[in-house]
Amino acid sequence: MARIAGINIPVHKHTVIALSSIYGIGLSRARKICGAVGVPSDKKIRDLSDNELEGLRAEVAKYPVEGDLRREISMDIKRLMDLGCYRGIRHRRGLPVRGQRTQTNARTRKGPRRLARK
């Protein structure tokens, strides 16, 4: 297993797919990273040289990934809730934030139904 950004990435997969296993790196960003380092995206991680791995580590370090990104997202949501804006209120109440209908749908966001007692 190769370690990039503190994550063990699978060595038997292609570079782009293996990089996308890091939280915060999708396929398009993984392709951009491979292009910047000069690594073919269809090359497997186990076939990379140490210099190529170091280049990938340096390039990934330029982006917010894993714990830093999770912390940043949670702080953004907390800021919205502290402001008391519409989106913050929706987050606080556990309702859909982006304008979806809630009368008949949104069961995932609202949680299981509360049954009325007789």
From Swiss-Prot:
Residues 107-118 have a biased composition (Basic residues). The keyword rRNA-binding applies. Keywords: Ribonucleoprotein, Ribosomal protein, RNA-binding, rRNA-binding, tRNA-binding. Residues 94-118 are annotated as: Disordered. GO terms for cellular component: cytosol; small ribosomal subunit. Pfam families: Ribosomal_S13. One of its GO terms (biological process) is translation. One of its GO terms (molecular function) is structural constituent of ribosome. Belongs to the universal ribosomal protein uS13 family. Part of the 30S ribosomal subunit. Forms a loose heterodimer with protein S19. Forms two bridges to the 50S subunit in the 70S ribosome. Located at the top of the head of the 30S subunit, it contacts several helices of the 16S rRNA. In the 70S ribosome it contacts the 23S rRNA (bridge B1a) and protein L5 of the 50S subunit (bridge B1b), connecting the 2 subunits; these bridges are implicated in subunit movement. Contacts the tRNAs in the A and P-sites. This is Small ribosomal subunit protein uS13. It comes from Nitrosococcus oceani (strain ATCC 19707 / BCRC 17464 / JCM 30415 / NCIMB 11848 / C-107). The lineage of its organism: Bacteria, Pseudomonadati, Pseudomonadota, Gammaproteobacteria, Chromatiales. The gene is rpsM.
